[in-house]
């Protein structure tokens, strides 16, 4: 790690990256879907970012969390500091998803019904896009790294879209898992939406009935995200796959999205991407990443 990891990840040392590439080249054979010799008839994959705004409630929660976190980080060192950084990043991502997730309100709101989509810019946009997907008779996968978020989204989507929504997560039994997959793959239109927790549904599934993949929140490691997308974009897929990655403007999500793209470019050269780089940021860098920008909340005027 000291010889290659730190120089490459932190300082973007091209010479060390070239040395590492030379060392591992004899031991790694990469076979990419973009190589026509590997898969000649795989259709196109179109990736896009869906930029959303925070609601006023989200912005207030976000700024409060940032102030508290920066104060704590200034007083901590070593492993304690790293833990505080990661915990704060998770909390801020939860706020970006929906206030109910960050406030631990549970899947059913106080009124007895599903969560209110108008409290989050992401859920507002997700409903709009899914209405278009369903109008075309298409099917969709929705990935989230938070099981609790999936539990909130499922009843909300079913209520507003009038369709049954399947939810596959770590607590799903093997029998239930296979039944969900079979139901979704039959493509009869009754169950056109499959929600998946990223770790439980990100690998080992064939879900080619889907032509839209939504990443409701982003993972630190792009390879994990790509594996999830490949549940739909794989051998057996006959139509173009649209991949939608949600990013909240003016928040840490937008800055981390830019950093992820940098990591992806680096990973394509040295085959690998880690997560430790997030905890290595100094307080000045953290403040720059976390501070809410002026464009985070949409100007109602």
What residues fall within each predicted segment?
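Short, polar/flexible loop-turn hinges at active-site or ligand-entry regions and domain interfaces
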Residues: 6-12, 71-79, 277-278
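Residue-level marker of structural boundaries
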Residues: 5-9, 67, 71, 186, ...
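Generic recognition of well-ordered alpha-helical segments
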Residues: 19, 23, 27, 61, ...
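SF2 helicase/translocase ATPase core recognition
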Residues: 29, 39-66, 173-176, 180, ...
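Conserved Helicase C-terminal RecA-like lobe
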Residues: 36-63, 76-205, 276, 282-301
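Conserved P-loop NTPase motor "coupling/switch" region that bridges the ATPase
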Residues: 1-38, 237
């Amino acid at each position: 790690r000291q010889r290659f990891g730190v120089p490459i990840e932190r300082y973007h040392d091209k010479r060390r990256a070239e040395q590492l590439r030379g060392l591992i080249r004899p031991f790694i054979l990469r076979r990419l879907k973009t190589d026509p010799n590997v898969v000649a008839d795989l259709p196109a994959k179109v990736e896009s970012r869906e930029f959303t705004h925070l609601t006023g409630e989200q912005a207030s929660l976000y700024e409060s969390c940032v102030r508290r976190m920066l104060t704590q980080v200034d007083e901590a060192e070593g492993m304690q500091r790293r833990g505080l950084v990661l915990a704060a990043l998770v909390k801020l991502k939860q706020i970006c998803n929906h206030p109910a997730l960050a406030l631990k309100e549970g899947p059913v709101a106080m009124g007895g019904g599903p969560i209110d989509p108008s409290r989050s810019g992401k859920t507002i946009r997700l409903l709009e896009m899914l209405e278009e997907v369903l109008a075309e008779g298409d099917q969709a996968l929705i990935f989230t790294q938070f099981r609790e978020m999936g539990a909130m989204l499922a009843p909300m989507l079913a209520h507003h879209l009038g369709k049954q929504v399947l939810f596959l997560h770590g607590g799903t039994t093997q029998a239930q898992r296979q039944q969900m997959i079979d139901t979704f793959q039959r493509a009869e239109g009754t169950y056109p939406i499959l929600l998946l927790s990223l770790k439980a549904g990100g690998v080992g599934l064939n879900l080619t009935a889907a032509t839209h993949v939504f990443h409701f929140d982003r993972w630190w490691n792009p390879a994990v995200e790509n594996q999830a997308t490949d549940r739909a974009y794989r051998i057996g897929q006959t139509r173009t796959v649209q991949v939608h990655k949600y990013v909240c403007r003016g928040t840490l999500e937008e800055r981390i999205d830019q950093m992820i793209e940098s990591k992806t470019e680096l990973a394509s050269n040295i085959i690998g991407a880690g997560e430790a780089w997030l905890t290595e940021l100094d307080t000045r860098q953290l403040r720059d990443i976390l501070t809410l920008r002026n464009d985070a909340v949409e100007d109602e005027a």
